[in-house]
């Protein structure tokens, strides 16, 4: 018990105070601007309404001055809710100020977690280059390839999200004791949740929209991280349980370290359940709200884990989690979708003839191999939702891009095609990507033909296929840019060999679209 108390005190000592005054510092918003986030208000909102980006600094200073006024933000939200369709400029100023505060607030509340990460890396003396490599999504697959071939069962878990927003704020109270900051976060969650209901019927979509995902995914990821503490706690209490967990945070802003510190409550409650959770081969991997739990144990053990997780979410977070969100399957008989790949364990039986003196006999052996493939049907569904093709996979034009130049249209389609090829370089059968490339290629041709008011056939006959070829770099050319010419690696083997890159720090948008 004394060890548990010391563990809690160590975590609590790292809680940061007085974060709220940083909202009034101009350099915070300059830092947000310099980071160049894709969803930053400095780049998107000003362009939507026709304002110049250079005026952002002026608006930042004006907003900081107005924030000193009492209840300014509350009056602004109420006024915008009542008169949002009256004035274009008033709506822009409210939108800009609120988004600016959201961006700055998101950076500020991340400070305690970034400090913990830096101190953890310094204590473990992990080189910076190695830390960057661990951030790559592809670094997860060599781990799975090494471990899954020796395991039996897998639990495919969809982590539920809490219905009430106050649960997210209550979780952050363990890490941040700055009361004004927590009140401000609760205010944003409440007001924006109601304000967006005028636009989007499904309020849960707003919490994860691209415009506000940075600040609203922060409490959500804290909640997911809190869900994982039970796994780490059981590992610490049982010498036989070894759990490895890496969590991703906000695409480019990650909790990219090994998770080791969690709040622990009611130790007596866990002591009654430790005995049937002991498993020398238990591994856990998560990305966003999707997780897999693999084990060498029996099906009964996996059912106990499922029952425990459902009850844990119900009694600890006070909401019901549907049991169907956890699927238990045998690795040798199923495939599971994770990180944009359809993964499975293939069994290759073989017979070896052995002869000893005058006697000969056959030895049957089974070789297990971890296999990753491209989920073509899922990708076609994502392309259909993005309006690149029909549901059946027939390419269609992209009318919204017809106002761009021919070079920009080719560049956009080519970039999408190369990114998909780069992300799925670890597939054992890259030929399945040919259909995806075909859809993008002819969607690009159909878009260009629509722009020039011509047919696809006439457009290609007039300009030739070379116009499209240069924007679709082959996988061999990508590999040749990475491996030196003196290497013994054959470029023709790139269609067979799996290649995992260490520069992919977020999942492809089309892969994550479905």
From Swiss-Prot:
Q: InterPro entries from the xrefs?
A: Domain_X, Maturase_MatK, Maturase_MatK_N
Recall the GO molecular function terms of this protein's record: RNA binding
Principal place of residence:
plastid
Which cellular compartments is it found in?
Answer: Plastid, Chloroplast
Top-level taxon of the source organism: Eukaryota
Q: Which residues form a coiled coil?
A: none
Q: Which GO terms describe its cellular component?
A: chloroplast
Q: Do the record's keywords include Plastid? A: yes
Mention one GO biological process in which this protein takes part, according to its record: mRNA processing
- UniProt keyword list: Chloroplast, mRNA processing, Plastid, RNA-binding, tRNA processing
One Pfam family, please name it. Answer: MatK_N
**Function field:** Usually encoded in the trnK tRNA gene intron. Probably assists in splicing its own and other chloroplast group II introns.
The similarity annotation says:
Belongs to the intron maturase 2 family. MatK subfamily.
Mind telling me what this protein is named? Answer: Maturase K
Native source species: Phoenix dactylifera
């Amino acid at each position: 018990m004394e060890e548990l108390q010391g563990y809690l005190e160590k975590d609590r000592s790292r809680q940061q105070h007085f974060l709220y005054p940083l909202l009034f510092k101009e350099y915070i918003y300059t830092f947000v601007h310099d980071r160049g986030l894709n969803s930053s208000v400095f780049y998107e909102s000003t362009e939507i309404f026709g304002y110049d980006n250079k005026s952002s600094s002026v608006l930042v200073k004006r907003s900081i001055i107005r924030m000193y006024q009492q209840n300014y933000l509350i009056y602004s939200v109420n006024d915008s809710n009542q008169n949002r369709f009256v004035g274009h400029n008033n709506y822009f100023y409210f939108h800009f100020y609120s988004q600016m505060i959201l961006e700055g607030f998101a950076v500020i509340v991340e400070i305690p977690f970034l400090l913990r990460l830096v101190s953890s890396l310094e204590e473990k003396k992990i080189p910076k280059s190695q830390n960057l490599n661990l951030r790559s999504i592809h670094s997860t697959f060599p781990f799975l390839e090494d471990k899954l071939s020796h395991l039996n069962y897998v639990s495919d878990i969809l982590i539920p999200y809490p219905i009430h927003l106050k649960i997210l704020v209550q979780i952050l109270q363990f890490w941040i004791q700055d009361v004004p900051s927590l009140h401000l976060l609760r205010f944003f969650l409440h007001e924006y949740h109601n304000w967006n209901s005028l636009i989007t019927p499904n309020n849960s979509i707003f919490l994860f929209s691209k415009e506000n995902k940075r600040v609203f995914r922060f409490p959500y990821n804290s909640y997911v991280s809190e869900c994982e503490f039970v796994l780490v706690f059981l590992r610490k209490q049982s010498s036989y349980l070894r759990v490895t967990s890496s969590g991703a945070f906000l695409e480019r802003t990650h909790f990219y370290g090994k998770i080791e510190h969690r709040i622990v409550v009611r130790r007596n409650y866990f002591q009654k359940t430790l005995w049937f959770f002991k498993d020398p081969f238990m591994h856990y991997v998560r990305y966003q709200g999707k997780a897999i739990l693999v084990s060498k144990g029996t099906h009964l053990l996996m059912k106990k884990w499922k029952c425990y997780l459902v009850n844990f979410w119900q009694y600890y977070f006070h909401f019901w989690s549907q049991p169907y969100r956890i699927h238990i399957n045998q690795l040798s008989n199923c495939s599971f979708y994770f990180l944009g790949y359809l993964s499975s364990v293939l069994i290759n039986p073989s017979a070896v003839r052995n002869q000893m003196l005058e006697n000969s006999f056959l030895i049957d052996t089974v070789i297990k191999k971890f296999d990753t493939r491209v989920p073509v049907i899922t990708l076609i569904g994502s392309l259909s939702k993005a309006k690149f093709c029909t549901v059946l996979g027939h390419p269609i034009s992209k009318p919204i891009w017809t106002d761009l130049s021919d070079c920009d249209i080719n560049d956009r389609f080519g970039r999408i095609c190369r990114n998909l090829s780069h992300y799925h370089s670890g597939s054992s059968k890259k030929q399945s990507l040919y259909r995806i490339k075909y859809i993008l290629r002819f969607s690009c041709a159909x878009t260009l033909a629509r722009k020039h008011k011509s047919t696809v056939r006439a457009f290609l006959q007039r300009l030739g296929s070379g116009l499209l070829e240069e924007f679709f770099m082959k996988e061999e050319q990508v590999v040749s840019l990475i491996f030196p010419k003196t290497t013994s690696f054959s470029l023709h083997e790139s269609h067979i060999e799996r290649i995992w890159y260490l520069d992919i720090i977020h999942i492809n948008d089309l892969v994550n679209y479905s």
